[in-house]
Each structure stands twice: as C-alpha cells, then as structure tokens.
Design a protein with these regions (language model features):
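Compact soluble domain cores
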Residues: 1-65
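Short, compact, well-ordered microdomains
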Residues: 57-96
Length: 96
C-alpha cells in the first residue's frame, strides 16, 4: 500500500517523449516510479532521503527523489511530489 498521495501524475515533455521513443528508458522510468511509491529514494543524497521520510510521515513538505541509470548517465530523472500532494512530476534535472 502507498504511504503517501501522489496527486496527478505528469511527466515533462522531455521525459514523456523519450518514454514513447525508447522502450529501455520507458522501463527505467516506470521502475523508478515504482521504487518511489515504495519510498525507495534511489540515488538521492542522504539528507534528502531523511527529509523525504519526514515529509511522508508528516505530510508537510515536498518529496524529491533522484534515479540514475547505471549505463546511461543522460537518463537521470527526478521525481517530485508537491508539498500539498496535488501532483507528482517525472522530469530531467535540466527541465527543473
């Protein structure tokens, strides 16, 4: 069972387009999202992992996680859930 609400799930144009064009990236992005839903914060730094855990417990802050593909450095994505849990976005760091 999910530990927090995600609101509307959206992806930026860059992530969406690459998911449509590349099955490998599509799998990576979906796998990252499943980890995110389990509170597996991927390649996020330790201080942000602690902040994410607190945000899940208290429901009062945004949640941000980082996922890096080991063989494709350009496939680094961020997943961000807004503090009010209204939306969750998959994006490339360059799209922030």
């Amino acid at each position: 069972m999910a530990k927090f609400e995600i609101g509307q799930l959206v992806a930026t144009r860059g992530v969406h387009d690459l998911m449509q064009e590349n099955p490998g990236f599509n799998y990576f992005a979906q796998s990252a999202f499943l980890k995110y839903r389990r509170c597996d914060w991927g390649d996020t730094c330790e201080s942000d992992k602690v902040q994410n855990d607190s945000a899940v417990a208290n429901g009062d802050d945004r949640i941000l996680a980082v996922y890096e593909h080991p063989e494709h450095p350009d496939w680094k994505i961020w997943i961000i859930t807004e503090w009010d849990r209204s939306a969750t976005t998959l994006l490339f760091p360059s799209e922030y």
